[in-house]
Swiss-Prot record:
This is Formamidopyrimidine-DNA glycosylase. The keyword Ion transport does not apply. Its cofactor is Zn(2+). Pfam families: Fapy_DNA_glyco, H2TH, zf-FPG_IleRS. Transmembrane segments: none annotated. It comes from Desulfotalea psychrophila (strain LSv54 / DSM 12343). GO terms for molecular function: 8-oxo-7,8-dihydroguanine DNA N-glycosylase activity; class I DNA-(apurinic or apyrimidinic site) endonuclease activity; damaged DNA binding; zinc ion binding. The keyword rRNA processing does not apply. Disulfide bonds: none annotated. Its EC number is 3.2.2.23, 4.2.99.18.
């Protein structure tokens, strides 16, 4: 599943290719995504509109139109975005496309079809967008994401720390890969209760999460199976994994074997010596 770094990389790659372009027509494969594809509304209200800017909120990408309408995309498990010449044959799992005024097509490809595309019409878009985002936590690379915020958010909770930082109501965009890597960098066992985390550990964890995410963005994201950027290229942060997917391999710090167990239903990787429970 694309996490924050992958979505950010896609946004950065797509933005210069579609901003300033006008949507000429929209279309779809007829196969349903996680939500029904609003093709009638898009054909009526988005055609003829200029794309003015793109924004990311967590794992959502918002495409703003010049009349105030907003197209909101979530990539789900296997979603990909790209821009192609209209003459180029569409791929098997291209389920949505926008024809642009420069004879290019902006295409959404999704093998497993767990992603979603919403259209927020002008006049209601801001209200609907705020409703969509109101339960999301802060951006981990934003100013409000601090150790004090994490400590306060953990009050009264008994979650494992890994489940806590993967909860989008607490903080957005941190999936399984970056939760594992951040906790290893912070030397915190993923199964520890949030109530056991000391203030200095909150400070270290907040810092490590930001460092890991920024490093991943610099590396173009992580390509495990499906992720490619807007130009079809792969990320290479996976070459920097310290624990994720490395069960029984030596810890890069102490050389002891990396362990793995299910926490919150997700595979968790950690060094039992460097990350004590």
């Amino acid at each position: 599943m694309p996490e924050l770094p992958e979505v950010e990389i896609i946004l950065r790659g797509i933005s210069p290719l579609i901003c300033g372009r006008t949507i000429v027509a929209v279309g779809g494969s007829g196969k349903q995504l996680r939500l029904p594809l609003p093709l009638p509304e898009l054909n009526r209200d988005a055609s003829g509109k200029e794309i003015t800017r793109l924004e990311r909120r967590g794992k959502y990408i918002s495409i703003f139109l010049n009349d105030g309408g907003i197209l909101v995309l979530h990539l789900g498990m296997t979603g990909q975005l790209g821009v192609f010449p209209k003459e180029q044959a569409r791929a098997k799992h291209d389920h949505f496309w926008c024809r642009l005024d420069n004879n290019q097509e902006f295409r959404y490809n999704d093998t497993r079809r767990f992603g979603s595309i919403r259209f927020l019409p002008a006049g209601k878009s801001r209200m609907l967008q705020e409703s969509l985002y109101q339960k999301l936590g802060p951006e981990p690379l934003g100013e409000t994401f601090t150790a004090d915020y994490l400590r306060r958010a953990a009050e009264g909770k008994s979650l494992a720390i890994k489940n806590f930082i993967m909860d989008s109501h607490i903080v957005v965009g941190i999936g399984n890969i970056y939760a594992n890597e951040s906790l290893f960098k912070a030397a915190i066992h993923p199964a520890r209760s949030v109530q056991s985390i000391e203030q200095e550990e909150w400070e270290k964890l907040a810092r490590c999460i930001q460092q890991i995410l920024l490093h991943a963005i610099d590396c173009g994201g992580s390509t495990i199976s499906d992720f490619v950027n807007a130009k079809g290229g792969q990320g290479y942060f996976q070459m920097n994994f310290k624990v994720y997917g490395k069960k029984s391999l030596p810890c890069p710090h102490c050389q002891g074997p990396i362990s793995s167990e299910k926490i919150g239903g997700r595979a968790s990787f950690f060094c039992p010596s460097c990350q004590r429970l």
